[in-house]
């Protein structure tokens, strides 16, 4: 942060760290630059020797001011389950069971009277003390890209022509929700990974950004660009406090 002026840090499997350590990291980085962004995966890959109450997991992020976590409820509700490649999500017509998790992401994982927290996919509580503690996303380096996921889950005679409007709806929900929107590089132009969900083991031919897609899918690219401009222009999409959201 001092030598290279890095302005953000992401923690893989942040749940293996303890709350006290994460808060200390936040404290020390804030001395250098209080705008440095800290976020991570609010879960574990396996069991941990840490007592459950001390783990820096999603449901404890309210105890870690200035630290954010990925909102996986939002991801799987909007685009379909990560654990079932053929499952559709809210944007592709599978509204049942996904309505509340979508609303949960829209309010930035905060407490809101219009969200039924019993209807969430993975979380059970409104864990974010402020919307800035929830990172809403629909794709990351792990798992399928949006377009790969849609090609697996959207079927039927009109499947191919439905992909673009579904992709647009996914990004509309993402970029108009409260919280911090996270966009994997290339999603704005339908970048795929040739159907590979774990591309860490794949060559550059799979992981590289294919810039020819920007021209091929210029309509989606411009649409996402305009959504970003809309979000930046209107404070209503960036309400900083949970109380402000409830009002």
Where in this protein do the model-derived segments appear?
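Alpha-helical packing segments of well-folded alpha/beta enzyme cores
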Residues: 1, 21, 166-173, 178, ...
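Active-site groove signature of glycoside hydrolases
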Residues: 1-17
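Alpha-helical structural signal in soluble globular domains
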Residues: 3, 20-32
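Active-site rim elements
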Residues: 10-13, 124, 154-164, 210-218
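Conserved alpha/beta catalytic core and glycan-binding cleft of carbohydrate-active enzymes
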Residues: 26-28, 35-185, 189-192, 200, ...
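Carbohydrate-binding surface patches
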Residues: 247
